[in-house]
């Protein structure tokens, strides 16, 4: 893949008002994407967003650029990222655009594209858009300008899609569920899905004002959800992130159930029903206990680099349909083409309803090993992980942990940091080993 100036692993992202998340760049990006897509015969693009106040500005700029290139835009309003992937397919749109910075604060935003199939744009299309961004803007003839329209029933369509992934012979009657929508894009979707399946729903994080997305709520901070589940004696709590592609859960005792445990529950249920295709893809950060639990079921497990994009790539390489991250990105490829928080949570709720078991009981098969993470700042220049001294200490630690844990040493891609992660059943040993490696890295500085 060629070096990109604008597109990262998850589209274009940054702080609002700072290049490239500016109205003039969004206008140019809309035009460039429009020119490239129009050359492929495209006529219409879907545009969705989360609840950030900057979404209004960016969607208007994108639409103007697309129109200048001769493409029409259909707005969905605030919708989860996976909903745009789904609607792009069902509307037969040539592409979908999502304006979101996912789990980031309100002052960040981003723009990413889906193909007509609801997957990431092919590399060659992204590269063509990047090349077009270097060209001066022009405008098609007046009669060929694009139009703008609104899809008024977008939410209803996606609600029906989500409900359709839940087994028809099961319901959620008798379940009390607390749902935290992070004041984000699922605020008008998830509560309705759950109610229509029969659950009693208590809502938090469903009052977006443009500035409170992901603020002390949602999948990245389940503290409020844990308290509400215990206070209301609910059966389960669900926390989505700002754009609805992540899920974290809380059991009836207030314990957090993370992406690794959720992935295991879904995998075991798929195995029992004969629907598991191949194995499961996790990441370098997936807890060792997940790997061990899957091994006990005879389920193959592979690790991808961190990032849902890389998880999906490895799934496609192996023709598997299930993968995810401990952060709560869960991809069930036979249901949607991208991580879908609502769909993943429904898969877990279906397992609870099917077996009359609590989330606590279902998650107990994966007793997460303690993870110790130490970030060590270095002066830049040579990578400390290439040092013989660090390699020697790391090798000695690995020998001590053999069979009981593992280490992961990574150089940050964005900062001069070495990330030292040690995972072990024995928390004290994990801490001790992490400190030894971190000390060796510091000495190189």
UniProtKB/Swiss-Prot annotation:
Single Gene Ontology BP annotation: UDP-N-acetylglucosamine biosynthetic process
Name of the protein in its database record: Phosphoglucosamine mutase
Lineage: Bacteria, Pseudomonadati, Pseudomonadota, Gammaproteobacteria, Pasteurellales
GO CC terms: cytosol
Known catalytic reactions: alpha-D-glucosamine 1-phosphate = D-glucosamine 6-phosphate
Gene: glmM
Protein keywords: Isomerase, Magnesium, Metal-binding, Phosphoprotein
Function: Catalyzes the conversion of glucosamine-6-phosphate to glucosamine-1-phosphate.
Originating organism: Haemophilus influenzae (strain 86-028NP)
Residue positions, PTM Phosphoserine: 102
Pfam families referenced in this protein's UniProt entry, alphabetically: PGM_PMM_I (PF02878), PGM_PMM_II (PF02879), PGM_PMM_III (PF02880), PGM_PMM_IV (PF00408)
Post-translational modification: Activated by phosphorylation.
Cofactor detail note: Binds 1 Mg(2+) ion per subunit.
Sample GO molecular function, one term: magnesium ion binding
Active site: 102 (phosphoserine intermediate)
